Amino acid sequence: LCYKSRPSIGDIDGSKDVPSEIDYNLWLGPAPKKPLTRNRLHYDWHWMWDYGNGDLGNQGIHQMDIARWFLGDMEVSPRVWSIGGRLGYVDDGESANTQVIYHDYETAPLIFEVRGLGDVKGSGKRPTYRGGSVAVFVECEKGWAAIRNYGSVQIYDNDDKKIKEFKGGGDHFGNFIQAVRSRNPKDLNAEILEGHLSS
């Protein structure tokens, strides 16, 4: 799940001038050559269909990586459905800020939810589920696992009693930098294919 309260990206009339230090043609790459129609060029691209896919692709791929590792699936799900929309305000954003995605893996379903609005209108406070707002939860017959950060996993029984905790060996950002510096892909903790499958 990805429950991150995201404010409106604003609603501008017409188009905006691209900063003179930006080669906009290079920035766009293969995307359609359209005028800039949002306030922040360098971050709000996440919410435009030509360049991004909202929090599903911005934050969600990290949680889906972890969920797939639990499933043991090294492939794209054979079937997927999604429902959602851009709710709560009218702005220049296009991609969904509220969305549920169902991956129909053979092992077990992987369900991902995006909530880009606060838990109470205007509060900006993140909603939570089982103590997590950006997390992975694995439901099993005799209990469940919670991954609420990138450094640990807690295991609970069906009465929500914590029975075990595992600590990780470090963050993946540092590992990526280390692999770039060594120029050795074998230094990566995970193959690049992992990110591709989740995205």
Task: State the predicted function of each range.
Residues 2-54, 58-199:
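Contiguous beta-strand/loop segments that form the cofactor/metal-binding neighborhood of enzyme cores
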